């Protein structure tokens, strides 16, 4: 048993927040799955880094540039191939759990963040292009993205709803998911294969707030917010309204902790993994955090510990005049901008 297997036994999946051709072709990803990794996430920044630093793309980039394709089409050709290959590596994991684990995420273009219909169309196209049952399409959790989530779920597509910082927005996402499931059931279609994760970002919250907080609260907000979001999750998915859908085969949305590498070197490097282990959750971790957790992390069900203390911390923060929902909206906008910039950098060498 590895520590990752111990975490899985506690009800949480650990995913790798990284993807590149070398990672797949070297067998490194397969080795990580043997250690207990259960899935993979990607984003424009990850692909930008991969394309720039992985020599295995050079020949394909040159060949694609000779074809009459747009830079975005060239990017998608390579990204879809990588996600498909990663899906194949993760397929045995996916099948061993009846389709509950082993997913690989590919994100829609950041420029579609405020365009619900455009998001739906691109998500459908990418899902068809990957053509793997363990592919997950990543959609930003803007109002438009949440509208798209409802449609995509009713289409039977698994979704990673990303860039969540707000508990209120997360609850809106659960309701959209439930509506999508209800539509699909009303049409007499199966829902058992549909998995949705709600990616709630952690370290960026502390990075944004710590400078304004007294020492006793530094590095505490993100974990307190995540614990409160998990309580919201428990209330929503144990309520009779969702139980009726669950009885017809619907899965619960899983909270996925994202941005769990520490940004402040003063904090323990496994802080945002050790502190957020709980049932029906996922933590997607960058390579360095994964290695650190395997080396010296702690597998213990911590997510439901000190819930009263978490609420008290959030109350203290509110008493200081800090509105975490206003902060959440700003952080989501910042995150969208970062992905747009990464996408532009990604496409520039493909012109």
Swiss-Prot record:
What GO biological process terms does the UniProt entry carry, in alphabetical order?
carbohydrate metabolic process; pentose-phosphate shunt
The superkingdom listed in its UniProt entry is Bacteria
Q: Where in the cell is it found?
A: Cytoplasm
Catalytic center at which residues? Answer: 138 (schiff-base intermediate with substrate)
Is Cytoplasm tagged as a keyword?
Answer: yes
Cross-referenced InterPro entries, in alphabetical order? Aldolase_TIM (IPR013785), TAL/FSA (IPR001585), Transaldolase_2 (IPR004732), Transaldolase_AS (IPR018225)
Which PROSITE patterns is this protein grouped with?
Answer: TRANSALDOLASE_1, TRANSALDOLASE_2
In which broad location class does this protein mainly occur, judging by the first location in its UniProt entry?
cytoplasm
Give the metabolic or biological pathway.
Carbohydrate degradation; pentose phosphate pathway; D-glyceraldehyde 3-phosphate and beta-D-fructose 6-phosphate from D-ribose 5-phosphate and D-xylulose 5-phosphate (non-oxidative stage): step 2/3
What keywords appear on the UniProt entry? Cytoplasm, Pentose shunt, Schiff base, Transferase
Molecular functions (GO terms): transaldolase activity
The reply on keyword Transferase is yes
Name the catalysed reactions. Answer: D-sedoheptulose 7-phosphate + D-glyceraldehyde 3-phosphate = D-erythrose 4-phosphate + beta-D-fructose 6-phosphate
What EC identifiers does the entry list?
2.2.1.2
> Which GO cellular component terms, listed alphabetically, does the Swiss-Prot or TrEMBL entry include?
cytoplasm
Name the job this protein performs: Transaldolase is important for the balance of metabolites in the pentose-phosphate pathway.
Please state which protein family the record places this protein in: Belongs to the transaldolase family. Type 2 subfamily.
Under the heading PANTHER family, the entry gives: TRANSALDOLASE (PTHR10683:SF31)
Q: Which NCBIfam families match?
A: PRK03343.1, tal_mycobact
Task: Report what the protein is called.
Answer: Transaldolase
